[in-house]
Swiss-Prot record:
GO terms for biological process: putrescine biosynthetic process. The active site is at residue 361. It comes from the Bacteria. HAMAP family: Agmatine_deimin. It holds the Pfam family PAD_porph. Its EC number is 3.5.3.12. It comes from Shewanella oneidensis (strain ATCC 700550 / JCM 31522 / CIP 106686 / LMG 19005 / NCIMB 14063 / MR-1). One of its GO terms (molecular function) is protein-arginine deiminase activity. Keywords: Hydrolase. It catalyses: agmatine + H2O = N-carbamoylputrescine + NH4(+). This is Putative agmatine deiminase. Belongs to the agmatine deiminase family. InterPro entries: Agmatine_deiminase, Peptidyl-Arg-deiminase_porph. It is an enzyme of class 3 (hydrolase).
Amino acid sequence: MTNVNVDVTPLTTKPSQDGFYMPAEWAAQQAVWMIWPYRPDNWRAAGAYAQATFAKVVDAIGAATPVYMGVPKAFLAKAKTVMPSHVTLVEMDSNDCWARDTGPTVVVNAEGECRGVDWGFNAWGGHNGGLYFPWDKDEQVAQQMLAQHGFARYRAPLILEGGSIHVDGEGTCMTSAECLLNANRNPELTKEQIEGLLRDYLNVKQFIWLQDGVYMDETDGHIDNMCCFARPGEVILHWTDDESDPQYPRSKAALEVLQNTVDAQGRKLKIHLLPQPGPLYCSEEESKGVTEGTGVPRTAGERLAGSYVNFLITNHRIVFPLLDPATDDIAAQKLQEIFPEHEIVGVPAREILLGGGNIHCITQQIPAGK
């Protein structure tokens, strides 16, 4: 266990000025970060089920990549008993456990030096549809993770969650208008201004804008639940053939965008379709385990935004969520076809979905760099 409480004074330049860029997720990684789940108003049984699931995710990742986990001081003793011994526990306050969205985006240069981008965070919408209050501890998470690694920090003047962007490492950024252009994120900025900031801080030059994310995704349609890059020139899209499903028009519109765009290198995209699980719904028993608080209520019968696209690529291993016995094997087979050189590892992940996300949402990779 390590303790981090270090102020990393932000740099006054921007990554693109300094020759830094965000690498693709398939680039070599030195670590993956996660955060301990404990909110009783988001996780049933005060997080007990989620904690057991997170431990399985740690094991699945840990076979390929070292895992760090931020844990508030009050929960360190329990974390030591629940989590595998190979995880590095780091004392760290947080309001919840979404490392993808509160953690830093680590950028690298040609020499392999790593630095981090610390984005603004307002709990997916602030006082206009945000998911909980306060979020002041989450605002400090990225800084603490960067301090753990000794990385210099850029402070970006933009509210942005890591789950709202995907990059191919070759100049292309994919995102959704539903999230990035939402009035509850950066209402004072135009689309062009947001693109300008992403160019500055990710060092990208081409944007693929999908309109919407997954139906009922409470993050306002994060791209990491809807579509991701498999490699340069290839994407994986969340899909259903059921034209009566509310997801169908969203996925169909996304497919049309993807079919009619090119990436930063001028390539037409190869598009893989990953089937939708379910549909899946929150049960009465599952909703009863969540207490009332400042978090979004968990209601019985509510549709869950389940998606197999919400997987992590880490050092030639794909860690993906098992969500529905009817489609889990189909998803695994499809992922193996897309990633023939990777090991495909499924983890039962319904408990993460009940909290509003999945495996990609609760992880944040640190590129290998040097």
